[in-house]
């Protein structure tokens, strides 16, 4: 990247990007041995968005990513393309959207001052929008047919939901108005190695398998909210939980623990999404504690080896500053002995001054810390930050209501 600050500023402003943190070259003192891990909820990215290479919102998102230049990038809310997704074409391979994003946007420089980055994609099935066939919201209806999904607006903004879509989504294993909506994509630089045969996923783990499950109760009868047949099958993860081992050039394996728990809310007096969010976050605590109930989708039980370095990444939809008892799980995760919870990414002082209503560690426009890159305590942390645009660079159609969050780590020999 060129080092002339005014040249950079003008070029990046043209794509809605102004320096909100130090560029990669300035932030990392030893790039050869350092890894930048970043999470970014880009907000409801659809297959139809990714089939084209000129979607304005994705171009701006890609510019931000290229500026920050992560080695490992988790994108939340990218559709896992599959049958039932309105943008899916019969006969195409499933789960190809991460590759589309890497090819159409990230590999192509989004400004003269930026460089394209070559990433290898990891995209795996999720529960969102996959219908359960059960009445999970207790409204007396089961509507298993995907309704008509509104097309994307011409300005590139996020498509609206419909009542029919919400009715369908409320009975899916994780809320989504069509199969695969709000999925996840992990993108890893080509000079690192994804150990694909060792990936563990926990998409199918049933909630009742957790011994101390936070069971939602009907506030009138104080009986379990879910009917027995629904509770027997209810999955814990609203999207999925992934353990993706990434081998670094020196041979060290870094485990990427990726997830996107359900948002607390949108659920009525029983607060079933609060309960679920709590236990989805707690699943990572239990995984670090090597709990035996944690069984992956291949049938292997147990958690992460006690010496394994890792980063917990994703939009956890939980703010530790929220006094609710349901946020105890995220506080336990941050305070876990195996987690370096003292590292709190923050916005730069200049960007904080631009929006004083936000706390320095807020990662969402709606004033909350919900997006995380939590390094293990056996990693050396070199730098961290929350990237925010300047007010002058905010486009009429926002890229997302979340900000990119990044941490630079190094594995000590």
Language model features with spans:
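Stable alpha-helical elements in mature extracytoplasmic
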Residues: 54-61, 94-101, 179-183, 240, ...
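Metal-dependent phosphoester-hydrolase catalytic domains
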Residues: 187-211, 236, 245-248, 273-312, ...
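Bacterial N-terminal signal peptides that target proteins for export
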Residues: 1-9
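Solvent-exposed loop/turn segments at secondary-structure junctions
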Residues: 42-47, 78-82, 126-131, 192-194, ...
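C-terminal motif of bacterial Sec signal peptides marking the signal peptidase cleavage site
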Residues: 18-20
């Amino acid at each position: 990247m060129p080092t002339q600050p005014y040249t950079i500023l003008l070029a990046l402003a043209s794509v809605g990007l102004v320096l909100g943190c130090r560029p990669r070259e300035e932030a990392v003192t030893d790039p050869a041995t350092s890894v930048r891990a970043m999470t970014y909820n880009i907000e409801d990215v659809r297959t139809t968005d990714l089939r084209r290479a000129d979607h304005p919102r994705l171009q701006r998102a890609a510019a931000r990513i290229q500026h920050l230049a992560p080695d490992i990038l988790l994108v939340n809310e990218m559709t896992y393309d599959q049958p039932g997704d309105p943008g899916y074409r019969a006969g195409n391979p499933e789960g190809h959207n991460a590759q589309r994003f890497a090819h159409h946007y990230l590999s192509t420089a989004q400004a003269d001052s930026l460089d394209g980055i070559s990433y290898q994609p990891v995209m795996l099935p999720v529960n969102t929008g996959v219908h359960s066939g059960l009445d999970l919201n207790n409204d007396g209806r089961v509507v298993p047919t995907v309704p008509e999904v509104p097309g994307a607006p011409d300005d590139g903004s996020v498509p609206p939901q419909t009542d029919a879509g919400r009715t369908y989504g409320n009975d899916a294993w994780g809320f989504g108005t069509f199969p695969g909506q709000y999925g996840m994509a992990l993108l890893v630089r080509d000079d690192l190695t994804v150990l694909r045969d060792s990936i563990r996923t926990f998409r199918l783990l049933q909630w009742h398998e957790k011994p101390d499950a936070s069971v939602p109760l009907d506030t009138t009868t104080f009986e379990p909210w879910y009917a027995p047949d629904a509770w027997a099958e209810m999955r814990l993860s609203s999207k999925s939980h992934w353990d993706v081992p990434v081998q670094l050039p020196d041979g060290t394996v870094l485990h990427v623990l990726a997830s996107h728990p359900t948002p607390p809310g949108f659920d009525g007096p029983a607060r079933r999404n609060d309960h679920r969010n709590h236990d989805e976050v707690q699943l990572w605590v239990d995984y670090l504690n090597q709990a035996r109930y944690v069984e992956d989708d291949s049938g292997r039980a147990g958690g992460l080896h006690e010496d394994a370095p890792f980063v917990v990444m994703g939009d956890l939809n939980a703010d530790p500053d929220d006094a609710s008892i349901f946020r105890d799980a995220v506080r336990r995760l941050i305070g876990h002995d195996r987690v370096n919870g003292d590292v709190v990414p923050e916005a730069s002082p200049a960007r904080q001054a631009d929006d004083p209503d936000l706390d320095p560690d807020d990662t969402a426009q709606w004033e909350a810390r919900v997006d995380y890159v939590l390094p293990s305590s056996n990693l050396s942390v070199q730098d961290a930050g929350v990237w925010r645009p300047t007010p002058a660079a905010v486009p009429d159609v926002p890229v997302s209501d979340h900000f990119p969050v990044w941490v630079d780590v190094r594995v000590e020999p």
